[in-house]
């Protein structure tokens, strides 16, 4: 079942996995506890830009300690949204 909640971004990771593929991961603290994204498939600059634009930020390094809305299924974040506006990025 999908749940929506406000969350604080606890950490952000942008790097390469053992195969050299670009990986991102975001951890969130919310009423459901600590949850995280699990995006390890093809990631490009457009996807990263979409996250930053949705959260109205200019730099990946600014993500920790910012607030967002998240959609959670189980313990996995499936979408990240703007806290005020109806803007979402599906993961």
Where are the predicted features?
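Short beta-rich binding modules
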Residues: 1-91
């Amino acid at each position: 079942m999908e749940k929506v909640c406000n969350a604080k971004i606890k950490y952000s990771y942008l790097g390469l996995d053992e195969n050299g593929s670009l990986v991102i991961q975001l951890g969130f603290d919310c009423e459901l506890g600590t949850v995280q994204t699990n995006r390890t498939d093809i990631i490009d600059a457009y996807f990263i830009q979409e996250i930053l634009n949705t959260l109205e930020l200019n730099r990946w390094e600014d993500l920790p300690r910012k607030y967002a809305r998240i959609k959670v299924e189980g313990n996995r974040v499936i979408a990240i949204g703007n806290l005020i506006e109806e803007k979402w990025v599906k993961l």
